[in-house]
């Protein structure tokens, strides 16, 4: 009886050690994944919008002059401020 209980105890301890090693490896992989995911989540998001015209490029709404206004007559300063204010409210 003693050898049987010793064998069962040994197998139980060996199983616990195996599970401990496996969980340590998976937690290291999880930590790497979480670190990479958090780095991606913290990265600044580009604010682009694509117009529905064929062959149109992405237009960035920033402080620079918009290139899509080139074909039109030069609007007044107040119209530009109104237009840029609306873009800022919509897209941040």
UniProtKB/Swiss-Prot annotation:
One of its GO terms (cellular component) is extracellular region. Coiled coil: none annotated. It is found in: Secreted. The lineage of its organism: Eukaryota, Metazoa, Ecdysozoa, Nematoda, Chromadorea. Its main location: secreted. The keyword Secreted applies. Keywords: Amidation, Cleavage on pair of basic residues, Neuropeptide, Secreted. GO terms for biological process: neuropeptide signaling pathway. Belongs to the FARP (FMRFamide related peptide) family. This is FMRFamide-like neuropeptides 5. It comes from Caenorhabditis elegans. Each flp gene is expressed in a distinct set of neurons. Flp-5 is expressed in the ASE sensory neurons, the 14 and M4 cholinergic pharyngeal motoneurons, and the PVT and RMG neurons. It is weakly expressed in the PB and 12 neurons. Also expressed in pharyngeal muscle. The modification Phenylalanine amide is found at residues 51, 61, 91. FMRFamides and FMRFamide-like peptides are neuropeptides. GAKFIRF-amide has an excitatory effect on dissected pharyngeal myogenic muscle system.
